[in-house]
C-alpha cells in the first residue's frame, strides 16, 4: 500500500502538495533524524534558513514522488479551491494501480467539508475498495512534514523549486474553467495521474 501525504499553503494563492511514499518506515527514519531535540515536528515556516536548505536537500534525496496542485487565486473561496484540489488528488489516485492511504494534515475548520467531499469523490471515482483516507495532526504523523516542505518550496519559487525538482513529478494547474477541476466521472477514468509504482 502506498501512502499519500497532503498539506496546503495559502501564501501565494491556494496550493496543495501531495507526496506519495511506498516505504514509510525508511522515510520516517530519515524525517525523524531531521527533527531537532525539543521539536515536535518539522514546519518550514518556523525553520532557520540553513536548516531549510538541509531539510529540502534531504527530501530531494528521498525515494518519494510529489505533485503540486496549484489553484492559485482562481476560486472565490479557499474551500472551493481545496475541494477542486482534492478532486484532482482523487482523480490521480484513481488512475494508478494499488491501494492508497491518503493522510491529510488536519485543519479542524475544514475536516467536515473534506470528509463530505472525499466520501462523494471516492465513490464517484469507483475506488472505495482501494483507498482509505484520514486527517492527522502533523505532530502525530511525521511524514506530513513532506508535503509541508514541498508546498513551502513551491510557493517560494526560484532556488527552492529547483531544490525539490528531483521528487516533483507533476504540477497540476487546478482551474474552474478546465475539465480537470471537475469531479471525476463515475468510471474513475480521468486525465492526469500519479506515476504508477
Language-model segments: which ranges?
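Phosphate-ester processing/binding pockets and catalytic centers
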Residues: 1-197
Amino acid at each position: 500500500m502506498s501512502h499519500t501525504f497532503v498539506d496546503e499553503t495559502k501564501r501565494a494563492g491556494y496550493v496543495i502538495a501531495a507526496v506519495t511514499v511506498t516505504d514509510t518506515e525508511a522515510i520516517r527514519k530519515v524525517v525523524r533524524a531531521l527533527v531537532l531535540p525539543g521539536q515536535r515536528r518539522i514546519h518550514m515556516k518556523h525553520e532557520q534558513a540553513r536548516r531549510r536548505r538541509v531539510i529540502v536537500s534531504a527530501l530531494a534525496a528521498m525515494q518519494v514522488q510529489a505533485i503540486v496542485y496549484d489553484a492559485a487565486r482562481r476560486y472565490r473561496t479557499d474551500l472551493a479551491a481545496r475541494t477542486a484540489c482534492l478532486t484532482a488528488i482523487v482523480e490521480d489516485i484513481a488512475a494508478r494501480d494499488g491501494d492508497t492511504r491518503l493522510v491529510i494534515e488536519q485543519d479542524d475548520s475544514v475536516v467536515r467539508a473534506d470528509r463530505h467531499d472525499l466520501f462523494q469523490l471516492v465513490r464517484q471515482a469507483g475506488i472505495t475498495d482501494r483507498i482509505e483516507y484520514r486527517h492527522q495532526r502533523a505532530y502525530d504523523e511525521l511524514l506530513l512534514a513532506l508535503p509541508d516542505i514541498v508546498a513551502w518550496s513551491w510557493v517560494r519559487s526560484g532556488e527552492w523549486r529547483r531544490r525539490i525538482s528531483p521528487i516533483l513529478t507533476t504540477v497540476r494547474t487546478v482551474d474552474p474553467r478546465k475539465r480537470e477541476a471537475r469531479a471525476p466521472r463515475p468510471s474513475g477514468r480521468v486525465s492526469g495521474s500519479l506515476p504508477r509504482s
